[in-house]
Amino acid sequence: MDVRRRSINSIHQIPSVGGTAPPMLKPKQPTKVDAVDLPDSPKASDALPLPLYITNGVFFTLFFTVVYYLLVRWREKIRNSTPLHVVTLSEIAAIFTFVASFIYLLGFFGIGLVQPFTSRSSHDDVWGVDDDEDVDEIVLKEDTRTVPCAAAPVDCPLPPIKPKVVDPVPISPPSSEEDEEIIKSVVEGTTPSYALESKLGDSHRAAAIRREALQRMTKKSLAGLPLDGFDYDSILGQCCEMPVGYVQIPVGIAGPLLLDGREYSVPMATTEGCLVASTNRGCKAIFACGGATSVLLRDAMTRAPVVRFGSAKRAADLKFFLENPLNFETLAAVFNSSSRFGKLQNIKCAIAGKNLYMRYSCSTGDAMGMNMISKGVQNVLDFLQDDFPDMDVIGISGNYCSDKKPAAVNWIEGRGKSVVCEAVIKEEVVKKVLKTNVASLVELNMLKNLTGSAMAGALGGFNAHASNIVSAVYLATGQDPAQNVESSHCITMMEAINDGKDLHVSVTMPSIEVGTVGGGTQLASQSACLNLLGVKGASKEAPGSNARLLATIVAGSVLAGELSLMSAIAAGQLVNSHMKYNRSNKDVTKASS
């Protein structure tokens, strides 16, 4: 408190007790920064005990002397076959002197860089206190007595003084002016928006500048899109280019899902009301009946380049070469050289005229594996070019893979992880938890999921809403949302067992494409959700086991979601539940632009 009072007394000259109080002396309010007398700014070299040129000479001499001495000793040890780690006291002193002089010289060359910051910090405040209006007002109001603290009587009235608060000089930080210039250059097109990160070296600042430039160019506000609170360095060169913010999606928890004897709390990122609640009800029914079991049928990512020949015969020659078991070991060695985890499993070929499509399948460890398999395929193509010089590589992907598209080849052959998950739901659980009966569920499944989907010409869509659960889990755990297309391929089967009392329900999903490393899995939120499931990162004990476990959890969650939705439809509760949990109460006319 005394420090603050002294700072006020230095501004307002207060007379001693008994003297005539002259008018209060107030500092003249500066109108410009250069109108205020400022003390000389300190220099970085002021901290040195000797003049700068003497200090530099001493350390330069020490540096080169000890370097010469250590080099001579090093040559002598080599000549005498003395181990280098055996050092004398003089050598230890020389090493210490070398390190000290090197650190000094390294710091000396940084003085020019440090100087502007030390100069600027000493000019930040005219009065020697923080440049804050609120702080100035508090300090001025805190001490309003007309005599020094020590001379003030106990019962002395303290007449209020109305000091004139000096407004701080508005000094914009240099970065703001610089940012304004960059924003203008982006708007004018002289600075590419995509180059801001490399130009500035600050991902958050680049996103803020890009965001402001976008608002000025489009004349649309992005006030509702958050900017702060996100690590933009974590997505640089990996997840997203030219960011201007991030989208918030709520994450709910369904479960516990009892699967293969273990309980899982399943994170689901969604904006669809009732989805998490419905999946949670399915988990409850499965849990009450002893849980679900899963089987992993296949684990292989695929990539299918397309090549062209001068004739169909030459395309067939390569097809026969690739499918010949005698050549597989050679091709596998070439393919596997690109990664520790990518192991070639098989090659399936298809011909269309003189064009050949080669579908390579390989294991990819705990990664989803698209980059891994693409590198391996490129190695094989380079190898084949020697024996088939007339082969024209049209593309590393020829859509026979098939990635992010509904395709029969994925439905039949599988892609990623192929999983079957099943459970037996007791009659009393069907009635109490699911509010329906076994016969109604079996009939609905046949007419809706099987016959209805066949009438619609569905491809892998023989289910109620597998895509809902897959999308929600994918968003929460950092998977590629676009791969929901083939990952949601699912056929849901329901059958009455035990004389029609109990329900056997299963989901078969041939192409679940997931990974626990790479891509969006390394983001903080998604990494936390993976950690919740116990599958974060790569498994050191059994490479690939985390990704396989995640695939079975996805299938188990789909099983719970299918069971609950089908029960709601069979019981006639779908409309009521969605009106309760999934209906917007906002006036949409006010939200329209």
UniProtKB/Swiss-Prot annotation:
Pfam families: HMG-CoA_red (PF00368). The keyword Plastid does not apply. Glycans are attached at N336, N449, N582. The chain crosses the membrane at residues 52-72, 94-114. Residues 115-177 are annotated as: Linker. Keywords: Endoplasmic reticulum, Glycoprotein, Isoprene biosynthesis, Membrane, NADP, Oxidoreductase, Transmembrane, Transmembrane helix. It is a multi-pass membrane protein. Residues 178-593 are annotated as: Catalytic. InterPro entries: HMG_CoA_Rdtase, HMG_CoA_Rdtase_cat_sf, HMG_CoA_Rdtase_CS, HMG_CoA_Rdtase_eu_arc, HMG_CoA_Rdtase_N, HMG_CoA_Rdtase_NAD(P)-bd_sf, HMG_CoA_Rdtase_sub-bd_dom_sf. It catalyses: (R)-mevalonate + 2 NADP(+) + CoA = (3S)-3-hydroxy-3-methylglutaryl-CoA + 2 NADPH + 2 H(+). GO terms for biological process: coenzyme A metabolic process; isoprenoid biosynthetic process; sterol biosynthetic process. It is found in: Endoplasmic reticulum membrane. Residues 1-36 are annotated as: Disordered. It is an enzyme of class 1 (oxidoreductase). GO terms for cellular component: endoplasmic reticulum membrane; peroxisomal membrane. Its EC number is 1.1.1.34. Pathway: Metabolic intermediate biosynthesis; (R)-mevalonate biosynthesis; (R)-mevalonate from acetyl-CoA: step 3/3. Belongs to the HMG-CoA reductase family. Catalyzes the synthesis of mevalonate. The specific precursor of all isoprenoid compounds present in plants. PANTHER family: 3-HYDROXY-3-METHYLGLUTARYL-COENZYME A REDUCTASE. This is 3-hydroxy-3-methylglutaryl-coenzyme A reductase. It comes from Camptotheca acuminata.
